Regions:
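Short, basic, glycine/proline-bearing loop/turn elements
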Residues: 11-24, 116, 134-137
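Non-catalytic positions within long, well-ordered alpha-helices that form the structural scaffold/packing
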Residues: 36-39, 136, 155
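Glycine-rich anion/phosphate-binding loops
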Residues: 22-44
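His/Asp/Glu-rich mid-to-C-terminal helical/loop segments that flank catalytic regions of hydrolases
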Residues: 172-219
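Single conserved hydrophobic/aromatic residue that forms the stacking wall/gate
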Residues: 1-6, 10
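Zn-dependent metallopeptidase/amidohydrolase metal-coordination segment
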Residues: 145-182
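Mid-sequence, gly/pro-rich, charge-dense loop/helix-turn segments that line enzyme active sites
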Residues: 51-130
Length: 250
């Protein structure tokens, strides 16, 4: 943690130091629960992605505002036992936090695109050519393996969420570029990482100026939990106390 201004800043490496956890094996629920316990109110995801569009070359950043979730082997909700909740994911990112990200990126004159759709694939393999062309036909912008179910779980925990995706390669659809390989990704990723560090520093310095007190994420559980109170056992309420205690303990 690093103390800045009104609160602390925490960094969480999804894949662990040295990148030894595959996307499918990331414990997204534990990560979000731990951040909520620490008092985190906002998450900015920074991740490597492949590009699905000609005008999003390697090195460019995308401030994502929509997702297509193609994952199938991950725990996607905190509310999977006795207590059921249906949070809205129509707008999965927080506009104020996106504005803060954009200002931090612009300050360093990093090439970027505001708004974009991120296809989240299960992995760990890269796409087939047929899959890549399918996602392009959906008008998606980038493809990666990490933002889902992270964004959904952050919403369930009432944590505002933004995603900054760093393009490392053209996915295999591009006829004039080699098929994706790890060495190619790492080479571009190292350059992107330096830009991301500066962006994050700028973000830490100014993000609180952009937070919307009326962001629907702040109290989304008020209208999401559908299970009748008499069906909620104390054991399950206690299990959910970190992410949902605000509403379950009323």
């Amino acid at each position: 943690p690093r103390s800045r201004g009104l609160g602390d800043v925490y960094k969480r490496q999804r894949h662990g130091r040295g990148h030894f956890i595959s996307p499918t094996k990331i414990n997204f629920r534990a990560n979000i629960d731990a951040l909520k316990q620490l008092g985190v109110t906002d998450i900015v995801s920074v991740s490597a992605v492949g590009s699905l569009k000609e005008d999003l070359p390697p090195g460019k950043f995308v401030i994502v505002n929509q997702f297509i979730d193609r994952t199938f082997a991950r725990e996607k909700t905190f509310f999977d036992d006795e207590i059921v909740a249906h949070v809205s994911m129509a707008h999965p990112t927080s506009n104020g936090l996106m504005n803060a990200c954009e200002e931090a990126i612009k300050k360093e004159k990093i090439e970027y695109q505001r708004n974009g759709t991120y296809v989240v694939m299960e992995g760990p393999q890269f796409s087939t050519l047929a899959e890549s062309n399918l996602y392009r036909s959906w008008k998606a912008d980038v493809i990666g393996m990490t933002n889902m179910p992270e964004a959904k779980l952050a919403r369930e925990a009432e944590i505002r969420y933004a995603s900054v995706s760093m393009v490392t390669d053209f996915d295999c659809w591009h006829p004039d570029h080699e098929n994706v390989d790890v060495q190619q990704v790492i080479k571009v990723l190292l350059g992107n990482a330096e830009k991301a560090k500066v962006m994050i520093k700028n973000l830490i310095d100014n993000f609180e100026n952009y937070i919307d007190p009326n962001d629907p994420t702040n109290n989304c559980l008020d209208v999401a939990i559908i299970t009748a109170p008499e069906k909620r056992t104390q054991k399950t309420i206690d299990k959910l106390k970190t992410v949902a205690g605000r509403v379950l303990n009323k």
